From Swiss-Prot:
This is Large ribosomal subunit protein uL15. It comes from the Bacteria. It comes from Delftia acidovorans (strain DSM 14801 / SPH-1). The keyword Protease does not apply. Signal peptide: none annotated. Binds to the 23S rRNA.
Length: 143
């Protein structure tokens, strides 16, 4: 067997139905589109979500909530990322310099994801309850 001689099994593929090619084909004249209407015309169809002029569902439903603009100033750092950093004292500037948080970050919180074995002192950085316990268990502190 050669790659260029592989063929699908006999009868597994069907030829595409040719429409609009005479009455004897069973799909002549209107070509399975029925009579008149927007869907029978060439190039004629509505956009997704259009309900014929009726107020569409996404506009009938009320708006909910908002997206906080403060989120872009908040950042999270995992315990495993803190472990790889290898610093004894960590503050916002050190995290920015290491590239763990963005330049516009103003608030950083350490979250408990991964393990930490080195003692780390955090200055001006928050931590979740689980992360705080893990840091203190490793001999670190949070100031």
């Amino acid at each position: 067997m050669e790659l260029n001689s592989i063929k699908p099994a006999e009868g597994s593929k069907h030829a595409k139905r040719r429409v609009g090619r005479g009455i004897g084909s069973g799909l002549g004249k209107t070509a399975g589109r029925g009579h008149k209407g927007q869907k029978s015309r060439s190039g004629g169809y509505h956009k997704v979500g259009f309900e014929g002029g009726q107020m569409p569902l996404q506009r009938r439903l009320p708006k909910r909530g908002f997206k906080s603009h403060l989120l872009k100033f908040n950042a999270e750092v995992t315990l495993s990322a803190l472990e790889q950093l290898g610093l004894a004292e960590v503050d916002l500037a050190a995290l920015k310099q290491a590239g763990l948080v963005g330049e516009i970050a103003k608030v950083v919180k350490i979250i408990k994801s991964g393990e930490i074995s080195k003692a780390v002192k955090l200055n001006g950085i928050g931590a979740t309850a689980g992360a705080k316990a893990a840091i203190e268990a490793a001999g670190g502190s949070i100031a």
